[in-house]
């Protein structure tokens, strides 16, 4: 249960009970009432601004109104104290019996605790990575891959119907260049001395095996074909090889997509999908023939001083109208974006999320304009921009490219430090803030390494379970039996840990609503810190140890508390795509 939603309902019921009405008649607007944890935990367990946001409507001083509401809330059987603070905040302290009851509910829910129905009925498409299939993934792709993947996992946990999608950019000029680059490697594999790779082609050694496979399969037959036919075949084989490489890289990072959508699909049958999308916009009055004035600065590729087919994107929020078709009848890249969005919308998605690099900031307004025009404003579109990742080693910057001139790849990073540190640390800053990734920091065993600190808490939980088996003979812990003794949990430090656990459902919903998966990483660190602190208290004070051999009932109660900590850590780490270890190796 989300205790804050519970008390939101209780507070609104209290407002009805005291017959609070607006001075001008009608119904009170309760939408601005907030119920959340106080910024300072010493002030209580629940804080609300109800009196402050309603005072003007009811014509009463905020503090006086707060006193009136507080007096009514004090009669709630679960409330221990109610205080009015500052200009009219109301702080509630809840009884230990309430927290004991909530802990029992958490234990009963197990790893489903925190799961929400918030997104029930909403079908969401999360598109992320979508790297060009021209080579292995470099470290710059890593952050967007993790942010998109964890956001999708989070939304699923919050009840949304989610599809993870990768858009394969396999129809552009860069693919023609790639095919010519592989053709060169094919000739090399046949024994030809190709010399230096010509400027403009892809020089990477990762194309050598592709050329070798072609030589093994076809011998010299490709050289005997018409060039266009040979290049078409090479293009298909190369895209398959590059996507296999990319999928393997993503698999190493535990990133898995449900759908791989080929851009070339939009261009089949004389680009029927693109033509249909433009026709739909035309029928809605969003397309016209005209010229665009030359923009200031460097001219974009799709600008020409001739009449073109244009999208009236300025009418739906964009800065300028966008070309859809050039004067020679060729479609612009943007026309493909329109068709792709329409394809998603036609598949039944009412919300589309794009996770892009910060260098795609200029695409945001045009994508939003497309969403409004294609869906008549019915579809929601969100673009998350991921800022750069800077690599460090012991505080010293690491060059992003090797001596060979190739970029450090995603696989290089994962192979050196492991999947879990990469995934967790890519979330340890909000996506729109630059992130520093230190190879040494993410592998050290200290509190300063968040992923170690959180996973160590998980391992410590299981250490407690093993101690229970050794010292109490409890190899199989019974959740009902543990919950039966929660009335033994009365120490303030234990109740404080229950409070932190109780924040999890609210955290899940807030992170899903605001599409901010980094909140989960922060919460898990805070929970781990609270658990480690409780462990240390037991080291300093034997009365607070999780296992007291001479008091089996109290031990069972504390084991139940540890079990819920373990459940939440496992749940959160699973959403992040990392392991919840039972022991540290």
UniProtKB/Swiss-Prot annotation:
It is an enzyme of class 6 (ligase). A motif ('HIGH' region) lies at residues 131-141. Its EC number is 6.1.1.19. GO terms for cellular component: cytoplasm. It catalyses: tRNA(Arg) + L-arginine + ATP = L-arginyl-tRNA(Arg) + AMP + diphosphate. GO terms for molecular function: arginine-tRNA ligase activity; ATP binding. It holds the Pfam family Arg_tRNA_synt_N. InterPro entries: aa-tRNA-synth_I_CS, Arg-tRNA-ligase, Arg-tRNA-synth_N, Arg-tRNA-synth_N_sf, ArgRS_core, DALR_anticod-bd, Rossmann-like_a/b/a_fold, tRNAsynth_Ia_anticodon-bd. SUPFAM superfamilies: Anticodon-binding domain of a subclass of class I aminoacyl-tRNA synthetases, Arginyl-tRNA synthetase (ArgRS), N-terminal 'additional' domain, Nucleotidylyl transferase. The keyword Electron transport does not apply. It is found in: Cytoplasm. GO terms for biological process: arginyl-tRNA aminoacylation. Keywords: Aminoacyl-tRNA synthetase, ATP-binding, Cytoplasm, Ligase, Nucleotide-binding, Protein biosynthesis. Belongs to the class-I aminoacyl-tRNA synthetase family. Monomer. This is Arginine--tRNA ligase. The lineage of its organism: Bacteria, Pseudomonadati, Pseudomonadota, Alphaproteobacteria, Hyphomicrobiales. The gene is argS.
């Amino acid at each position: 249960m989300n205790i804050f939603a519970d008390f939101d309902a209780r507070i609104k019921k209290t407002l009805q009970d005291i017959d609070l009405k607006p001075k001008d008649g009608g119904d009170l607007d309760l939408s601005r009432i907030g119920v959340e944890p106080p910024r300072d935990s010493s002030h209580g367990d629940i804080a609300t601004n109800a009196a402050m946001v309603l005072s003007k409507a009811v014509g009463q001083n905020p503090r006086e109104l707060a006193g009136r509401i507080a007096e009514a809330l004090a009669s709630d059987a679960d409330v221990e104290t109610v205080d009015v603070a500052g200009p009219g905040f109301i702080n509630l302290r809840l009884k230990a019996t309430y927290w004991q009851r909530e802990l029992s509910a958490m234990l009963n829910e197990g790893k489903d605790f925190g799961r929400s129905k918030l997104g029930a009925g909403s079908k969401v498409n999360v598109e992320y990575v979508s790297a060009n299939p021209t080579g292995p993934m470099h470290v710059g792709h890593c952050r967007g891959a993790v942010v998109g993947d964890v956001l999708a996992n989070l939304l699923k946990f919050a009840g949304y119907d989610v599809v993870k999608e990768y858009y394969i950019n396999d129809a552009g000029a860069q693919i023609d260049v790639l095919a010519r680059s592989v053709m060169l490697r094919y000739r090399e594999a046949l024994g030809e001395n190709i010399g230096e790779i010509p400027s403009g082609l892809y020089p990477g050694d990762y194309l050598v095996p592709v050329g070798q496979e072609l030589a093994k399969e076809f011998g010299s037959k490709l050289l005997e074909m018409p060039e266009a036919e040979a290049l078409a075949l090479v293009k298909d084989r190369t895209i398959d090889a590059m996507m296999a490489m990319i999928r393997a890289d993503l698999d190493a990072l535990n990133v898995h997509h449900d759908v791989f959508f080929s851009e070339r699909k939009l261009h089949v049958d004389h680009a029927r999908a693109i033509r249909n999308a433009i026709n739909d916009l035309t029928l809605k009055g969003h397309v016209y023939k005209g010229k665009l004035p030359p923009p200031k600065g460097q001219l974009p590729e799709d600008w020409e001083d001739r009449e073109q087919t244009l999208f009236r994107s300025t009418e739906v929020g964009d800065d300028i109208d966008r070309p859809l078709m050039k004067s020679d009848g060729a479609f612009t890249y943007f026309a493909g974006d329109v068709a792709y969005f329409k394809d998603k919308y036609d598949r039944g998605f009412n919300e589309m999320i794009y996770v892009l690099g910060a260098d795609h900031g200029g695409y945001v307004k045009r994508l939003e304009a497309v969403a409004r025009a294609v869906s008549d404003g019915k579809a929601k579109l969100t673009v998350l921009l991921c800022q750069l990742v800077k690599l460090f080693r012991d505080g010293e910057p690491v060059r992003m490219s090797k001596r060979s001139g190739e970029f450090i790849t995603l696989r290089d990073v994962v192979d050196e430090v492991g999947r879990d540190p990469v995934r967790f640390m890519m979330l340890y800053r909000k996506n729109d803030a630059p992130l520093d990734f230190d190879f040494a920091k993410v592998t050290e065993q200290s509190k300063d390494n968040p992923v170690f600190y959180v996973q160590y808490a998980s391992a410590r939980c299981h250490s407690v379970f093993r101690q229970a088996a050794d010292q109490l003979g409890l190899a199989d812990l019974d959740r009902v039996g543990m919950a039966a003794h929660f009335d033994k949990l009365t120490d303030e430090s234990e109740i404080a840990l229950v409070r932190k656990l109780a924040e999890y459902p609210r955290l899940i919903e807030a992170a899903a609503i605001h599409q901010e998966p980094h909140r989960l990483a922060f919460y898990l660190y805070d929970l781990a810190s609270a658990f480690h602190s409780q462990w240390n208290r037991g080291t300093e004070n034997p009365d607070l140890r999780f296992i007291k051999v001479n008091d089996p009932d109290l031990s069972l109660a504390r084991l139940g508390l540890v079990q819920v900590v373990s459940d939440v850590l496992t749940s959160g780490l699973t959403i992040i795509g990392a392991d919840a270890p039972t022991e540290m190796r």
